Design a protein with these regions (language model features):
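Bacterial N-terminal signal peptides
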Residues: 7-18
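A sequence-level detector of short, solvent-exposed, charge-rich linear segments
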Residues: 16, 20, 57, 64, ...
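N-terminal Sec/ER secretory leader and immediately downstream segment
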Residues: 23-104
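Mature, soluble, non-transmembrane domains
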Residues: 102, 106-218
């Protein structure tokens, strides 16, 4: 019962009004990885056929190395968001209307209530509002492991494995079409060997492996 009340409180407190009134942001830095259900590096012929129909879903993950947000220390904590949109999440970059989104957020189960709220606020801010209309906030045991050549993330119903090595296939004039969905430094394109969400709260589930659909890098805010 207590856990259910905490989760409900976090969803309410994660509203834009509550996040805006939370005070100064502080300084925070760490590692970031994302993958969407569309290739970010592909040929024009493929993009032309997929732009309106794919890329509606994504997983975004932040691992804080050190720092605070809204005055709350987040050292060593992690937050993961699964996002479902009504259209390609990056379509605005190529002239389309911005997607309306719903988000399920997984906050580090080691965090206290104030830290969990700060993690949600940080994800909302660094994703430039993409992590919005939050329908679920779930405390979870989260794995975020940089294994050298790949990054592994697991949280609740989210599974993400990103290879840092990507071949630049010249087929069909391949090029980069999109940028990261969140604020990130030194962003590099990766291959999502696994990109899956199996939860029920977003009205969408996905599994979209083996695609050049990922970005990884660091963040500082």
């Amino acid at each position: 019962m207590k856990r259910g009340m905490l989760v409900a409180a976090l969803v309410v407190l994660a509203s834009p009004l509550a996040l805006l009134s939370a005070g100064g942001k502080g300084a925070v830095s760490g590692e970031y990885v994302e993958a969407r259900t569309a290739e970010v590096f592909t040929g024009g012929c493929i993009m032309g056929s997929e732009a309106e129909t794919v890329g509606k879903n994504a997983v975004l993950a932040w691992k804080v190395n050190q720092g605070s947000f809204n005055g709350v220390s987040l050292d060593g904590l992690t937050v993961v968001a699964a996002v479902a949109g009504d259209r390609n999440l990056g379509i605005g970059e190529i002239g389309g209307a911005k997607a309306a989104t719903r988000s399920a957020v997984f906050v580090d189960s080691r965090a206290n209530a104030a830290q969990q709220l700060a993690l949600v606020a940080m994800a909302t801010e660094l994703s430039k509002g993409l992590v919005g209309n939050i329908v679920e906030v779930t405390p979870s045991a989260i794995e975020f492991a940089d294994r050298g050549k790949e990054i592994h993330v697991a949280a609740g119903q989210v599974a993400l494995d990103v290879s840092k090595e990507m071949s630049h296939d010249p087929t069909c004039g391949a090029m980069q079409w999109f940028h990261p969905l969140a604020t990130v430094d030194q962003a590099a394109i990766g291959v999502a060997q696994q990109n899956a969400f199996s939860g029920s709260g977003l009205g969408a589930k996905w599994s979209d492996p083996n695609r050049r659909s990922a970005f990884f890098g660091t963040f500082a805010y």
